[in-house]
Amino acid sequence: MALSVETESHIYRALRTASGAAAHLVALGFTIFVAVLARPGSSLFSWHPVLMSLAFSFLMTEALLMFSPESSLLRSLSRKVRARCHWVLQLLALLCALLGLGLVILHKEQLGKAHLATRHGQAGLLAVLWAGLQCSGGVGLLYPKLLPRWPLAKLKLYHATSGLVGYLLGSTSLLLGMCSLWFTANVTGGAWYLAVLCPILTSLVIMNQVSNAYLYRKRIQP
């Protein structure tokens, strides 16, 4: 028996609500897990994984979920208010990422090790630089009068697409970090696989949200 369009819509909305709630919990849980594992303050390096997971797992995920019609924690507020909260969270994520990057550079300097010698380090640097550009681009959406020649709809589309790329870069950096000697020495077996699933799950949720809000809608328009 075929489901009606209305029933399918309700099911789809319920699935998106459930996946959004899962993304909130996973982003927070993964960050707490890394913090417990790293024990921030025990060494200079210990702050690096904590700050990077806080930036790319928790803050950036929450910033993007801010616009989810089903799972935004502030969906009762106006889009203008949510946009400003989004920008604040993105800025905090950038600051945490910059601090985390700076501390690991200092740590390697103290040990006399080469900088950006691994795929993880290179992906992390690219993700931080992209986040900086993304935050700068967000100013144009907060104050569209600064870019009068650009249609606001196109600015939103470009910003959303670029933001998705930046988020995936951050998630890639986290995934590569979980292949590092430090992480694999402390997390093994099933726990490692569960940890790897965390940024993959949140990335899928964010990809679905952005695709439905901007990319898919733009494709079906004549």
Swiss-Prot record:
It is found in: Endoplasmic reticulum membrane; Cytoplasmic vesicle membrane. The chain crosses the membrane at residues 18-38, 47-67, 86-106, 123-143, 163-183, 187-207. It comes from the Eukaryota. It is a multi-pass membrane protein. GO terms for cellular component: cytoplasmic vesicle membrane; endoplasmic reticulum; endoplasmic reticulum membrane; vesicle. This is Transmembrane reductase CYB561D2. Residues 2-17, 68-85, 144-162, 208-222 are cytoplasmic. The gene is Cyb561d2.
